Design a protein with these regions (language model features):
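Short secondary-structure boundary segments
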Residues: 31-32, 53, 108, 140-142, ...
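A ligand-binding cleft/hinge motif common to bilobed small-molecule-binding domains
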Residues: 33-43, 152, 157-177, 287-297
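Extracytoplasmic ligand-binding site segments that recognize negatively charged/polar headgroups
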Residues: 36, 49-66, 99-123, 240, ...
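A short, structured surface patch at a secondary-structure boundary
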Residues: 1-33, 133-136, 235-236, 240-287
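Basic- and aromatic-lined ligand-binding clefts that recognize polyanionic substrates
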Residues: 76-131, 232-256, 319, 323-335
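Structured C-terminal subdomain patch of bacterial secreted/periplasmic proteins
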Residues: 59-78, 82, 89-92, 160-226, ...
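His/Asp/Glu-enriched short active-site or ligand-binding loop at hydrolase and phosphoryl-transfer sites
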Residues: 118-143, 184-187, 261-266
Length: 335
């Protein structure tokens, strides 16, 4: 886990002494890394691989491949790039019949020190465009933007991080924007856009779902009838708890957003599961008749799935009301 990795400071202010104490074979650095830090590493005989900001997604793919080669993980890097490209294809397919893209404004900074956004020559502009957004700042270069022009162009959507949402929506003159008045201010983890890497493709998917909800599966309308083996269950509402009977199922539930990313799998006996009384059990192998009877007596539905089957993913999306994410995961699995 990332939390267990030793911290050596920030990207622009690294603790070189601590870094050297870890005896790295290679240091990956962005352009924020100071020349002095590079010199200290060079003097200590530690090679540094600079990762420059790329202009488009193709450049990001190349960067990931380069890192994979540098750390002898070419196969993993290739898999990562393939998954990113598949997600980009997924968005392109879902937006194929869109006639007109909504106008959008990406908030980098706002307020008394000026307005900042992603101009047409920035990497973020490419992400907004790939997600089916018409960036109102695409006709300017760099990051600085005019408040007057923002008000004049009055975008349909405003995209920002959750930290800035309340302040932006309650500060004049932004309160006059149609997006603020109509509730089309959308939040996203802006690191997914600003920091180049595998999550850029996830940002495109998430933004596309915000800007074009009509192109993606809608929320589940309960009740949902689900057939599992010879049994049919009537799911009245979104299950509030779930037990995954295997690590493979657990990982799939993570993928579609049912289980949190930092959760860890724990194998439990049928008796312990029954005592905990989850709303539903998801399994990829049949329980014995005796075990199944215990779940039936406790009124706990057991849904049998094939973790590698894309139709199974769609079904789980319906059960847990995460249809859009399940649709994406199913597309990637089928690719």
């Amino acid at each position: 886990a990332v939390s267990e990795v030793e911290s050596v400071g920030s990207i622009s202010n690294a603790d070189i002494e601590k870094l050297l104490s870890l005896e790295p074979d290679l240091v990956l650095a962005s352009t924020h890394f100071s020349d002095d830090a590079v010199k200290q590493l060079d003097d200590a005989g530690v090679p540094v691989l600079y990762l420059y900001d790329e202009g488009d997604m193709e450049g990001v793919y190349d960067m990931i491949s380069l890192v994979g080669e540098a750390v002898n993980c070419e196969e993993a890097a290739e898999k990562t790039v393939d998954e990113m490209q598949t997600k980009m294809d997924y968005v392109s397919d879902r937006l194929a019949n869109v006639d007109e893209n909504p106008t959008v404004y990406y908030v980098v900074g706002y307020g008394e020190y000026g307005d900042y956004t992603a101009g047409g020559d920035t990497f973020v502009n490419g992400i907004l465009t790939a997600a089916g957004g018409d960036n109102i700042a695409s006709d300017v270069e760099g990051w600085s933007y005019s408040t007057e022009t923002l008000l004049e162009k009055d975008p349909q959507y405003v995209i920002l991080n959750a930290y800035n949402e309340e302040g932006f929506c309650t500060t004049d003159p932004y309160t006059e924007l149609s997006a603020v008045k109509n509730g089309f201010v959308e939040t996203i983890d802006t690191n997914m856009l600003d920091r180049q890497g595998p999550r850029n493709a996830d940002a495109v998917v998430e933004l596309a779902q915000m800007l074009h909800p009509e192109c993606f599966p809608s929320e589940t309308e309960y009740p949902v009838n689900v057939k599992s083996g010879v049994v049919e269950y009537n799911i009245e509402s979104c299950p509030e708890s779930v037990y995954a009977a295997s690590e493979e199922v657990f990982d799939l539930l993570k993928e579609i957003g049912v289980v949190s990313e930092d959760a860890e799998y724990e194998q439990k006996s049928v008796e312990d599961v029954v005592l905990e009384a989850p709303a539903v059990v998801v399994a990829d192998a049949e329980y014995s008749a005796e075990e199944k009877a215990k779940f039936d007596d406790a009124n706990i539905p057991v849904i049998y799935v094939d973790a590698e089957d894309d139709e199974t993913v769609i079904t789980l999306g319906q059960i847990f009301n995460c249809n859009a994410k399940a649709d994406e995961v199913a597309y990637v699995k089928a690719a």
